[in-house]
């Protein structure tokens, strides 16, 4: 029972890693609310992706923070900042104050971001590690889907009520303090002799380039998923396909598909191997094209479910690939670099959508552009894999 609760508590750290986009169902009402104050929709959309910029800043400071502070203190501080930054706009909805609170939310998520993933590799090895990484990806998606669904229900009260979802951070904090030990004993026993016997080998430029390519891949997948999360509620309401609550339901189902992919993750890795990377973006592109051509809520939902399935699969595969190919001495650095790519993709979502707006006539055309880029990348990866 103790081991089970330890696993649950470790997985719970991932429940709110992408919670910054959970309030997306409230975007249409937020645009109306701040529009009355003369604030454009672009600036309102920025509030949703804004925490990602703070996350990037924290990740850049991660090596220094890890040397100065203990892992436990960093995680506890992160969960406290996450909860406070998420809750604050309930008290005051002034744009500038909400802007600051979203940055605080990002600081909190950034502090636990890399550790929620690397801690799995510290506590587990072999097939159990692969299984836990798959479950971690599912936990991340489950948290996002659950929070997005709850936000949609709270939207019937007011858009600011959706921020109540960040109270989950306090529950996760309690689980972590109660059930997660400070340092696995087996890691202590292994690391001490290594430090005496040999100095850590530097990260080669070739290996660094490999890590950066994985970071770009993961960032691209997350850019598309984040853009979908921002754009689906707008498309549903503007085109009269449904209500904001129905858009919230689609987003929740889209994210829940990630749980299904996480469940089959280890089996899919065994079947497709390295070809899984190209397959993910090819299917992602197909789903985006379905969303672009959709003239009903049902068809839009089918495309969203397709993208939701492969999104989590692609990101989880990148982290698994890193844990398999990168030495443990450099694992935290590699994880941090990939997370930088992931959060850069998420942070740029609203900016990229704004860029697309300069040469497109409608919000749904972003799906077509992303779809074409995804299929192009998938073909390049497939050809590279086939002829290398």
Regions found by a protein language model. Name each.
Residues 57-94:
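Conserved MFS/SLC helix-loop-helix module at the cytosolic interface between two early adjacent transmembrane helices
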Residues 95, 101-139:
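Cytoplasmic helix-loop-helix junction between adjacent transmembrane helices
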Residues 135-181:
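Helix-loop-helix hairpin linking two adjacent transmembrane segments in secondary transporters
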Residues 323-360:
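A late C-terminal transmembrane helix in Major Facilitator Superfamily
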Residues 210-252:
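Extracytoplasmic gate region of multi-pass secondary transporters
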Residues 85, 96-104, 298-306:
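Paired small-residue
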Residues 111-124, 313-327:
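Intracellular juxtamembrane helix-capping segments at the cytosolic ends
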Residues 58-70, 261-273, 357:
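Helix-to-loop junctions at the C-terminal end of transmembrane segments
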């Amino acid at each position: 029972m103790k081991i089970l609760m330890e696993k649950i508590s470790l997985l719970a750290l991932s429940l709110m890693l992408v919670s910054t986009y959970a309030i997306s169902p409230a975007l249409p009402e937020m645009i109306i609310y701040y529009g009355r104050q003369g604030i454009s929709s672009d600036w309102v959309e920025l509030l949703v992706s804004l925490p990602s910029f703070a996350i990037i800043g924290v990740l850049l400071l991660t090596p220094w923070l890890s040397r100065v502070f203990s892992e436990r203190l960093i995680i506890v501080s992160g969960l406290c900042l996450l909860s406070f930054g998420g809750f604050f706009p309930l008290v005051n909805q002034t744009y500038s104050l909400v802007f600051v609170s979203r940055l605080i939310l990002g600081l909190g998520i950034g502090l636990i971001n890399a550790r929620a993933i690397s801690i799995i590799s510290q506590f587990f090895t072999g097939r159990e590690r692969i299984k836990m990484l798959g479950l971690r990806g599912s936990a991340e998606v489950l948290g996002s889907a659950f929070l997005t669904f709850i936000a949609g229900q709270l939207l019937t009260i007011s858009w600011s009520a959706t921020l109540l979802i960040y109270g989950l951070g306090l529950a996760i904090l309690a689980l972590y303090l109660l059930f997660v030990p400070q340092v696995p004993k087996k890691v202590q026993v292994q690391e001490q002799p290594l430090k005496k016997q040999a100095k850590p080998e530097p990260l080669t430029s070739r290996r660094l380039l490999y890590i950066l390519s994985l970071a770009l891949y993961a960032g691209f997948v997350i850019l598309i998923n984040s853009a979908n999360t921002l754009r689906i509620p707008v498309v549903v309401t503007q085109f009269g396909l449904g209500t904001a609550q129905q858009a919230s339901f689609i987003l929740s189902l889209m994210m829940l598909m990630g749980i299904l992919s996480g469940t089959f993750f280890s089996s899919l890795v065994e079947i497709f191997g390295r070809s899984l990377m190209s397959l993910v973006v090819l299917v992602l592109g197909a789903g985006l094209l379905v969303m672009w051509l959709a003239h009903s809520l049902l068809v839009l939902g089918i495309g969203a479910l397709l993208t939701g399935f492969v999104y989590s699969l692609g990101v989880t595969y990148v982290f698994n690939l890193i844990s398999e190919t990168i030495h443990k001495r450099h694992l935290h650095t590699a994880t941090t670099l990939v997370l930088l790519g992931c959060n850069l993709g998420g942070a740029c979502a609203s900016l990229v959508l704004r860029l697309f707006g300069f040469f497109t006539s409608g919000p749904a055309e972003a799906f077509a552009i992303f779809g074409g880029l995804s299929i192009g990348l998938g073909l390049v990866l497939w050809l590279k894999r086939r002829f290398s």
